[in-house]
A protein has these predicted regions:
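Catalytic cores of nucleic-acid ligases and guanylyltransferases
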Residues: 1-170, 175-216
Length: 216
């Protein structure tokens, strides 16, 4: 991926694993992250990919003050100059009415996501006239996530978080019961480390400390 990014500039994008033309899950990406040694096999099995969302700089030119519509045009030209299969553009979602956008969010496959629909988290709304602002600006931008799937699961593991959450058990692994050859068994199905308030975090942290049965 580094070899593909040889033009001077600054891209706002997302690091992905794209295998056989399909964007893989975040769990697959985690198998490439934080590796001290990256073997040729790992590079082949987990090829890094960049999906470009915005362009902050083109060469020495700072584009952050330009409206999004102008930055998008520059981004499209920038990615075209890169001319690499390792970098692509986040598709624009056209809509004439709010109901069209609701439908696109609900079914990304019909709104340009194609085979990557299962990996889409939602839609990002940006005012066409908005400048590029640091942090998480409210008003000109809005990240509208897809509705989550809900299941009843068992909290299997809890890990301490990072930064201000380093003193709390804030990273959780959940599992569900399944019938195996040896009888019922718990199988991990996913992880979660956000989606709860600070008050709920304290409640879960206390529960974990009081009910831990094993440590790893």
């Amino acid at each position: 991926l580094v070899d593909a990014l040889q033009l001077p500039g600054a891209i706002d994008g997302e690091l992905l694993i794209r295998r056989d033309g399909l964007v893989q899950s975040f769990n697959v990406l985690q198998q490439r992250l934080n590796r001290k040694t990256v073997t040729p096999k790992l590079l082949t099995e987990f090829p890094a990919h960049l999906r470009a969302y915005d362009l902050l700089a083109d060469g020495d030119e700072d584009l952050r003050g330009l409206p999004f519509s102008a930055r998008r045009e520059r981004l499209e030209a920038f990615v075209a100059r890169l001319n690499s299969p390792r970098v692509d553009l986040s598709p624009m979602v056209g809509f004439a009415a709010w109901d069209d956008l609701v439908a696109a969010r609900k079914d990304p496959a019909t709104a340009g996501a194609g085979a990557d629909a299962a990996a889409v988290e939602g839609v990002m709304l940006k005012r066409r006239a908005s400048a590029y602002l640091p942090g998480r600006p409210t008003g000109p931008w809005w990240k509208w996530k897809r509705d989550p799937f809900i299941i009843d699961a068992v909290l299997m593991y809890a890990q301490r978080g990072h930064g201000k959450r380093s003193s709390y058990y804030s990273d959780y692994t959940f599992g569900v019961w399944t019938r195996g050859e040896a009888g019922d068994e718990l199988v991990p199905v996913g992880k979660a480390y956000f989606g709860f308030t600070d008050e709920e975090l304290l409640q879960i942290d206390r529960f974990v400390r009081r009910n831990t049965t094993k440590r790893f």
